[in-house]
A protein has these predicted regions:
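A generic structural motif
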Residues: 72, 102-104, 120
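Compact nucleic-acid interaction/catalytic patches
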Residues: 92-102, 108
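Short, small/polar residue-rich loop motifs at catalytic or cofactor-binding pockets
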Residues: 15, 94-96, 114
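Beta-strand initiation motifs
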Residues: 8, 108-110
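A structural microfeature
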Residues: 111-113, 129
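Hot-dog-fold acyl-thioester-processing enzymes
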Residues: 1-64, 118-164
Length: 164
């Protein structure tokens, strides 16, 4: 298991916008934002011991229950990305968090991805409490992130705002 990183927010994931991620508008396609964020989720899961080894050893797995992406500013081919992660809440089976994608050299916010992740028992494929090793680490991460302000993108719903 990796050494627990209690930086707040978690700031461990880096990526580069690949040529195949570019759409006909000349910027990163919406689906590849999700790919980049999914890799950042893998980085988060490594922090509490529920990564690929967790599934490969037939202990359990994690499923995304809900996801919301905001697209704040374009990124293009070759742009370096820095993705941070903030734990918003957790319970015995679930983890609520938000990723923020930044242009790694220019520093602007490109997108966010808010997720609800659930622990799944490998054998039953049903929800299950986090194993003790994961729960303990999640609690430490959540405590480290608790003082952070909740990002304005968290909890958003999709709607057209009408002027009254």
């Amino acid at each position: 298991m990796v050494e627990l990183d209690l930086s707040a927010p978690l700031d461990r994931h880096r990526a580069t916008v690949l040529p195949e991620w570019i759409d006909w508008n000349g910027h990163m396609n919406v689906g590849f934002y999700v790919v980049a964020f999914d890799k950042a989720t893998d980085t988060l899961c490594e922090q509490f011991g529920c990564s690929w080894d967790y599934t490969r050893q037939e202990i359990g797995m994690t499923f995304v229950l809900e996801a919301h992406v905001t697209y704040d500013r374009e990124v293009t081919q070759g742009d370096p990305l820095r993705i941070t992660t903030q734990i918003l809440d957790h319970d015995a089976k679930r983890l609520h968090f938000i990723h923020a994608m930044y242009h790694a050299t220019e520093g602007y916010l490109a997108a966010t991805n808010e997720l609800m992740l659930m622990n799944i028992d490998y054998a039953s494929r049903r929800s299950a409490p986090w194993p003790d090793f994961a729960r303990e680490r999640i609690e430490k991460l959540a405590a480290a992130h608790k003082p952070l302000p909740v990002p304005e993108q968290a909890g958003r719903i999709i709607a057209i705002k009408r002027k009254k």
